[in-house]
Amino acid sequence: MLRKTRLFTPGPTPILPAAQTAMAAYAMHHRTADFRGLFSRVLADLKDFIGTNHDVLVLASSGTGVMEGAVSNLTSAGDKVLVLSAGKFGERWADLAKAFGCSVEIVSAPYGETFELDDLRQKLRPEVSAVYVQATESSTGARHDIQAIAQLVRGRGDNTILVVDAITGLGTTHFGVDGLIDVIIGGSQKALMIPPGLAYCAISERAWKRMETTRSPRYYFDFRKARKAAARGESPYTPATSLVAGLAAALEFIRQMGDGDLIRGRQELIENAELAARMTRAGAEGLGLRLFAPSCPAAALTAIQAPSGTESGAIIREFHDRFGAVVANGQGEMKGKLFRIAHLGYYDSLDTLAILAALEQVLAQVTGRAVKYGAAVRAAQEVYSQYRQGANVPATAR
């Protein structure tokens, strides 16, 4: 029987067909006027996609590479930093900061939850040089209130730099960047609908000034080199030219979502993720399943607890073997306990209805229990119908 492979993971995500075509067709050398023009357009468009006037960098790297750069460029060994950690990727910030000799203090929250601002307030002392946090903790499906965190950090003065990993946040959540966030990081394989291999960030003037005095070793991820090259429409080292061409196509697609306005297109993309998230949560609850981050759900993905007595790996295998659907397991301490369905980037409402219909079949097979077929799809359809009738899609916790 024919079975297509479909990605429902929070990265990589499905690739935009126009981006596939652009990547296949582009074969220009990176030290040419053609590529400089392309790269300059991408940098300018990313400003609108992020929502910033800050300088933007694009590097051939995973998102973790630019996360590392946000530590090595902004700290020196011995600096005191705060890491807000509520999952696998918060733990990664702590590991990176320790690798560069920082004195790390952690503001923690349980997996699937978000932070108490009072905990951050108590630890945000004047000697803290930087705060590192995720916008969306994709290992748990939780979304953190970056605006509230940023206002608290900025309210403590100019000494503390705020760095936000928004790799699954950009394109799924609205951010107020300028004046609040010093470094915000994104990745190509998320809402931007192209393969892994590019990471990007916007950097404030405060952060650029900090780099003049920090002493951590850096070479490939020296942001100052990248900024100097970007001013010429280049990268300091060989860029991933085909991926840049794909990124340009994806940004143009988003612009057309907004009828020629990229900022409006970004808003449409975010609304699309919000709607899919609401549909997915309603569908899961329609089957009696428990959401993992119910108080702070992300728009990028939905984390769902495996039914009692069922290991989530069995659910994931059944999704793949029966339908060709690739769904993500939990990570860290939640591996085997939950599964994650993504809906950021190149997903639409039909994708959402399809994965929920598949979920009904998967649960019946894996648990051996009676499933009311249509329950998940019906619940999601009701959300979709309300949206089509003009009801606003309420934003989940930001």
PLM feature spans:
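A glycine-/small-polar-enriched, mobile loop at the entrance of the PLP active site in fold-type I
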Residues: 4-60, 64
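Active-site C-terminal subdomain of aminotransferase-like
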Residues: 14-15, 191-282
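Conserved beta-loop-alpha segment that forms the PLP phosphate-binding cup at the N-terminus of a helix
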Residues: 53-82, 86, 90-93
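Active-site phosphate-binding strand-loop segment of PLP-dependent enzymes
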Residues: 114-171, 183
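Conserved active-site segment immediately N-terminal to the catalytic lysine
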Residues: 177-189
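PLP-dependent enzyme catalytic core of the Aspartate aminotransferase-like
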Residues: 333, 337-398
